Amino acid sequence: MLPSQSPAIFTVSRLNQTVRLLLEHEMGQVWISGEISNFTQPASGHWYFTLKDDTAQVRCAMFRNSNRRVTFRPQHGQQVLVRANITLYEPRGDYQIIVESMQPAGEGLLQQKYEQLKAKLQAEGLFELQYKKSLPSPAHCVGVITSKTGAALHDILHVLKRRDPSLPVIIYSTAVQGDDAPGQIVRAIELANKRNECDVLIVGRGGGSLEDLWSFNDERVARAIFASRIPIVSAVGHETDVTIADFVADLRAPTPSAAAEVVSRNQQELLRQVQSTRQRLEMAMDYYLANRTRRFTQIHHRLQQQHPQLRLARQQTMLERLQKRMSFALENQLKRAGQQQQRLTRQLVQQNPQSRIHRAQTRIQQLEYRLAETLRAQLSATRERFGNAVTHLEAVSPLSTLARGYSVTSAADGAVLKQVKQVKVGETLTTRLGDGVVISEVSAVTKTRKSRKKTSNP
């Protein structure tokens, strides 16, 4: 045999590694049911046990971070359902499974299916409140979908008869347990909607195990309840039993009897309400009649009081009383008017204007004399002050100085000449005398030794 045709040779380590990879990649995660044996829990908190059936067994490990989510304590001999990964422990070549989750077998498997369907329908929105239909109030006809031989129907009919015997009830008999039950329940719901005889439906059964109630966890039943045009009250099992039908139904009743309570009226309570209403109406009528009678008596009395003869007599009496009051008032008014006239006459005499006018004229004459004297004195003093001022002005006036033989010479720009250096030859000068003005032209300028004002000859 050529070397190229020789079989592959594995080491033990490589063999175990290859087998482990094949198991993990090919098998992946699986569900396994079996009986627990050799269960141990060391200080690490991990679980080690064996799963077996009648002919085989396999070693299992469930690590602490996974087993703390298990809600029960595994027992020797207990049947369980586990979700696990298949692997191989390479150092010893031991084939084993690593458990991720564990639950009791039987009902545990059903519970798993229940949770999966619940999550699916919830994700689709079948449990949303916006899709819940209101129950009729009051209901005029009730449909019951349940077994005709079950205790649930007996309880429902008993409650309805006690509370509202006149309420019509239509029974849609169906199986509530077994493989055929979901299909029969769906057909009963569809039939009730097709006939449209009822305005509310009760769908339910009595209590039982999870397996007994499983028909109401069927997806077909849930979708039929959701699609029903007639409002549905679910009444499955006892108060602690919760099914998928309860989540989808428009209302969940804890028991069938409670469902009957919900959809019916309490006739005895209605009778009590009618009697109470009747009593209130009778009391209201009695009050109304008494009030009307009292009103009639008042009106009758008023009519008697307003008889024409009585009114005429009252008017006559009132007229006489008013006449007396008017006469007395006129006398008092005339008396007060006379007294007022006398008082005004006395005041007029006391306040005669002639004397007041005479006193005013005398006062005016006195004031005129005093005013004239004051004006004359002020005028004389003013004239004297004016004369003194004129005399003083004449004494200091430049014109008086000119009249005494002096003169004032100014240049062409009007500046008064005080020194010869202000004058230039050929310049025109103006000289003011006491009786006039002389205009001359400078032909020569001579400065004297003494600082005297130089005069120029024209």
UniProtKB/Swiss-Prot annotation:
GO terms for molecular function: exodeoxyribonuclease VII activity; nucleic acid binding. Keywords: Cytoplasm, Exonuclease, Hydrolase, Nuclease. GO terms for biological process: DNA catabolic process. It is found in: Cytoplasm. Its EC number is 3.1.11.6. Pfam families: Exonuc_VII_L, tRNA_anti_2. It catalyses: Exonucleolytic cleavage in either 5'- to 3'- or 3'- to 5'-direction to yield nucleoside 5'-phosphates. The keyword Hydrolase applies. It is an enzyme of class 3 (hydrolase). GO terms for cellular component: cytoplasm; exodeoxyribonuclease VII complex. The keyword Nucleus does not apply. Belongs to the XseA family. Heterooligomer composed of large and small subunits. NCBIfam families: xseA. Bidirectionally degrades single-stranded DNA into large acid-insoluble oligonucleotides, which are then degraded further into small acid-soluble oligonucleotides. This is Exodeoxyribonuclease 7 large subunit. It comes from Escherichia coli O6:H1 (strain CFT073 / ATCC 700928 / UPEC). The lineage of its organism: Bacteria, Pseudomonadati, Pseudomonadota, Gammaproteobacteria, Enterobacterales.
